[in-house]
């Protein structure tokens, strides 16, 4: 009898057919090939009105993407699932929330200068504002078979918000912004996204400030005996004087109220990071604004403002700034003799 019972049970195992799921453990859809499809969206947005280049400006639906690429997914359902229902879609943001909501759309931090809101097309006429859940994908139906659809990240709209004004381009590196999941129930979307959406490119404001032709950028300090630097750490060598640097700019599309700040970047002296490196460890150059404030290279908070004129045409205004440069001893030692020079790069930023 024991042998007969064992054979009977074995027969029950091999005789069972169809799909069964424990409890509610069914519903999530997965990519047909097991691999999430990645949509990459190129961003090239222009802002012709420079007055919009201020913190808080919202640029709704400025990019509409549609690449026509279908994705394939499969949704497994139990045999008891007789009445076909629309596939449900969930859109998850992969960015930190910024706290901004405009017209029911949530914005997320994209870069230091931009936030983004994403609106993904999930059927012919239905869009999901990321984040969303339990949205019906009306054209995506079927159970236990491969479903092919363009409405899973292949089209959508992007909106941007400016958090910090910028000059020229605000570059967006390749950034994952959203993932899409699908399910036949609203209880479980699984852990494997059907698709993802990444963006890269730039938002451009047609405004700039350029150095006027003929502006002198070389600053000669003259010749000094090595002894002039000795025991004068942080001070100019004996006989040295501050040299003026007068910079003039042509600025276009800089609207009233916008401030343009100047800062420095470049190699600095190892013993005094305030000083521009001059190729000699005992010598450096400090750059100051007209008020005497030292502009520390590579310090984003160490800035000074350009003096902007009023508009002299519809889009143009002049800008100028007076800086002072002075050589110093960075160690108090007598430097070795030679000819030395240094380079620093000027950057302009909107405020």
UniProtKB/Swiss-Prot annotation:
Keyword Metal-binding listed? The answer is no
> Which top-level group of life is the source organism from?
Bacteria
Q: Which residues form the signal peptide?
A: 1-22
Q: Where in the cell is it found?
A: Fimbrium
Describe what upregulates or represses it.
Induced during the exponential growth phase.
From the UniProt record, give one GO term of the biological process aspect: cell adhesion involved in single-species biofilm formation
For this chain, the annotated S-S bridges are: none
GO CC terms in record: pilus
InterPro entries documented for this protein:
Adhesion_dom_fimbrial, Adhesion_dom_fimbrial_sf, Adhesion_dom_sf, Bact_Fimbrial_Adh_Pro
Question: Which SUPFAM superfamilies does this chain map to?
Answer: Bacterial adhesins
Enumerate the UniProt keywords alphabetically: Fimbrium, Signal
Pfam families named among the record's database cross-references: Fimbrial
Q: Which family does it belong to?
A: Belongs to the fimbrial protein family.
Q: What does this protein do?
A: Part of the lpfABCC'DE fimbrial operon. LP fimbriae may participate in the interaction with eukaryotic cells by assisting in microcolony formation.
What name does this protein carry?
Probable minor fimbrial subunit LpfD
Q: Which gene encodes it?
A: lpfD
